[in-house]
Amino acid sequence: MTTREQPAADHWRDRVESHHDQSEAVQDASALDDDFWRPFASHFRLDPRRTDDPVLERLVRYIGPDQTVLDVGGGAGRFALPVALRCRRVTLVEPSEGMLDEARAGAGEAGIDNLTVVTGTWEEARVEPADVVLCSHVLYGVAEVVPFIRKLEAHARERVVVLKFINPPQSRLSPFWKAVHGEERIEMPAMPELLSVLWEMGIYPDVEMLEPREAHGYSSREEALDQLRRRLYVVPGTPEDGSLQTSIAELMVETPDGLEIKGALPGRQGVVSWWTR
């Protein structure tokens, strides 16, 4: 199949590249960390023995105690660590050293010794196949999504399991982008576009929708300002920073737990999975 015969994949690529181009146009290269995710990494680390995570409980239904799991883009081990407690072995592939530092620390604290971490992108990673390949909230920013998915398939002996939001996870920050940078944010593709790509590839997955998840808030104005500066590529003390601080006052509301974005709707996500055998 030629590129011209893949309109869904072409649309996906255009959206991702346009989003990245828009981001690069406002970035101050001198202010960027080589590891974008390092400042956020600790927020993605959770107790691997937690029992109050309905998403985790749904995911582990796809994994047996004697199976091996490959977690692609698994970050700080949010799912890799608890899954490792319930299966034979987990391999975690992740390009962010900041995220992997958190995963290693979490594994050490929990006494998990059946986790292998591989530093690098999925495109460049060389790993052995596993029974189940998990890919949680990774595909949004992948321009060449078809070969990425084909590689997931090639490494899954039994099943591919993808976790995806209906809307891109950062879409709730779009009003701040417009207030700061003066233009509408180009959104990355999400679950609807993924399904179109999969169907175009001849993959017809099962889709299981999960319960809505409450929108993430911030414990304080300082935390909100720090995280939004990083997410929106805003340098402190610039005119854009002034616009951001004004927009926080206008677009957020105080709650007993801190700050929340006005009108932010609960996130809807689903498990997209298919057999490969």
Describe each model-derived feature in a short phrase:
Residues 1-63, 159-186:
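Conserved class I S-adenosyl-L-methionine
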Residues 70, 76-123:
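Class I SAM-dependent methyltransferase SAM/SAH-binding core
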Residues 126-132:
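A short acidic, Gly/Pro-enriched loop at the edge of an enzyme's catalytic core
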Residues 132-145:
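A short SAM/SAH-binding and catalytic strip from SAM-dependent methyltransferases
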Residues 146-161:
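A short glycine-rich, Lys/Arg-flanked "PGG" loop and its adjoining helix->strand segment in the class I
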Residues 187-202:
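Short alpha-helix
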Residues 204-277:
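Conserved Class I S-adenosyl-L-methionine
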